[in-house]
Amino acid sequence: MRNTFNEIKLVLILGFIISGVLLSSGQPVAEAVEKVGLKVMAKEGVGKYLSDGDGMTLYRFSKDEINKSHCIEGCAVNWPPFYIDPAAVEDGLEPSDFAVITRSDSRQQTTYKGMPLYYFKNDKFPGDTFGDGIGDVWFIVTP
């Protein structure tokens, strides 16, 4: 029994030594992948539209002005501002079309061609577009 216990200890010690050598070898354990922050999606009946890197739809508010959001307080609860910096964009999108503004509530928000971008709180899954056309002022963003 004592020999079995010593063998288990030896195996554990060797395991720790080997894992320490592998981790300290300077070689990455997993390769880092740059996440795309913005991409183009397509949906039947909707066409092409912008989404975040996870496929969540992005919207624009027709009452906004270039580089100025008018969706504040309660509005921003239902339509959370989208923000990513830097805006890593998918091939086919122009990085220069995206910028960041500081809102009146001091939060930062990403813009597309000057128009602030938003999520819709009732979109729960990638590809949901439930906010499109709400109040005739909210629309998906088309590239």
Model-derived features: where do they sit?
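A subset of signal/propeptide-processing and intrinsically disordered low-complexity segments
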Residues: 1-2, 47
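Bacterial N-terminal signal peptides that target proteins for export
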Residues: 2-12
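Short, low-complexity, intrinsically disordered N-terminal modules
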Residues: 4, 22, 26-29
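Bacterial N-terminal signal peptides
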Residues: 11-21
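Compact beta-sheet-dominated domain cores in extracellular/mature segments
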Residues: 26-143
